């Protein structure tokens, strides 16, 4: 008789149903939970950039639940494969990243992941790098790996098909990438991996290689992906439509308040721990007071990463600043030597190249720049500044001027 699923396993499946898209396969996952063995969960990251957002954290929180049941995360830093570049989701070839940058990104990635995962217990988490095996991998062994998979299978990938339609190049190292990622699963003896659906092709190759090489195939769980805070494309640093784990509590709250009303329920389901029954009741009330429930959502997102004092302070700051129109006291100071400025030059100095001239001009044209509460629409207007003057740019940026000697 098959061993029944215990209460902890049932609760885990119920919790995972909330954030998972697909499980390959559910029966295999249930058997894994019933087995009583410590599950080895592969979490592979190619550290092309050092930031994590709350979409990535969905996977981390699921792994945290598994850790709390005694299972082990193998935190795999793809330092070797990062040098190749994952073509996933790209219509062009990813640039090669220097090793020094990879190491720096990995450190920052781990720092942010520690906000969720248990890193301090070696029985619950182990850090590995795939350069451990690939840097010493022989050409003959690699050719054996290649011989197991067909060109037709690799080229069937949707992003490659899109490039073919556009008559754009596909480089050989990009086709090899999923083979290497798949082989990682075999080396680590992965029982389970939790990924975004965009990584499914690569991890299915992991199952394939495990079968070919005589190992039990890993279970794959893909997680739900929401639009970013702009309500359009998924969260991305390049689009600046994300809530980052590395963002301050203030930024997290402010960015949460940008979420479109129609996404409040989805964000509550996927990025918070509010019970589903309560979310169903909230869904019926949102249209009558969306601002109230958006603040509720912002608080619930913050609770996962910050303490109650921070949550309370950030809501008060937001309400004072944006509802009561009170200029905050703790705004940054820009120190300057001169009193006479062209408006755009002063604003440009504050942003220190993080915004282009065209972006800044557009802000002036939109009436989004003010000097001591007076709107400035002409970017080339000459202004005379003294210490304690306040410049506001957009809805959420202020800075105070301090003139040397004045």
Specify the residue positions occupied by each region the protein language model found.
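N-terminal catalytic cores of NTP/NDP-binding nucleotidyl/phosphoryl-transfer enzymes
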Residues: 23-87, 194-200, 206
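Short, hinge-like loop/turn segments at secondary-structure boundaries
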Residues: 90-95, 144-147, 238-239
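Divalent-metal (Mg2+/Mn2+/Ca2+)-assisted nucleotide/phosphate chemistry catalytic cores
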Residues: 98-110, 114-222
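A charged helix-plus-loop insertion that forms the helical arch/lid used to bind
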Residues: 87-103
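Conserved nucleotide- and phosphate/pyrophosphate-binding catalytic cores
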Residues: 201, 209-406
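Buried hydrophobic packing segments
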Residues: 59-66, 179, 203-210, 301, ...
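N- or domain-start disorder-to-order transition segments that initiate the globular core
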Residues: 1-35
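Short acidic, glycine/serine/threonine-rich loops at helix termini
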Residues: 85-89, 137-143, 231-235
